[in-house]
């Protein structure tokens, strides 16, 4: 089975917008994150277990608005008793089966249902402010939040502070619209798509 990326028809490589005469650290970089395993884990209301007792690849399930991660895997809090697990590891399914009980958690494979765009650069928060009503001055590395971007429901994962890097996730069916919104907002600063 061949996997077709959600942005296959729109993600064009190259430099665009107001990039001429600028250093690489002054423009926005945009890339599609693909070939990730994505699972949603929801603790049942009837579950008596403490989430602090569970780990995936030695990562704890984080508290409100937090992310725990390493080089291959990130666990995002997306709501009360609700998390996304993103991993480049082919063994994520096995790790989840080994560590989480179907009697305690609803576990759903979302690997083909999300579009993920990674943005970085010093003007990143200005790009986000153009379409999202969140106070980005309060958000830092290893935090996550659900919001909207120009009317599209998104999840934001703040991956790094230096350079400022965020992953924006939406449903696959909104991926192209989100991509157009983000790239349009980036034209003012110039952007390079990888």
Describe the function of each predicted region.
Residues 1-194:
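Basic, glycine/lysine-rich polyanion-binding surfaces/domains
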């Amino acid at each position: 089975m061949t996997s077709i990326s959600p942005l296959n028809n729109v993600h064009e490589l190259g430099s665009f917008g107001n990039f001429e005469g600028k250093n690489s650290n002054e423009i926005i970089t945009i890339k599609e994150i693909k070939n990730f395993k994505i699972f949603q884990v929801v603790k049942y209301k009837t579950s008596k277990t403490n989430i602090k007792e569970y780990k995936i690849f030695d990562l704890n399930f984080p508290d409100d608005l937090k992310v725990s991660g390493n080089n291959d895997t990130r666990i995002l809090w997306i709501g009360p008793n609700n998390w996304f697990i993103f991993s480049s590891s082919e063994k994520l399914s096995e790790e989840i089966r080994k560590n989480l009980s179907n009697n305690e958690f609803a576990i759903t494979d979302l690997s083909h249902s999300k579009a993920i765009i990674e943005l970085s650069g010093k003007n990143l928060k200005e790009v986000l402010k153009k379409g999202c009503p969140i106070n980005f001055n309060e958000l830092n590395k290893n935090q996550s939040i659900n919001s909207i971007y120009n009317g599209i429901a998104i999840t934001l994962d703040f991956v790094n502070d230096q350079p400022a890097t965020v992953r924006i996730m939406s449903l696959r069916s909104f991926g192209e619209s989100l991509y157009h919104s983000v790239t349009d907002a980036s034209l003012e600063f110039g952007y390079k798509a990888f």
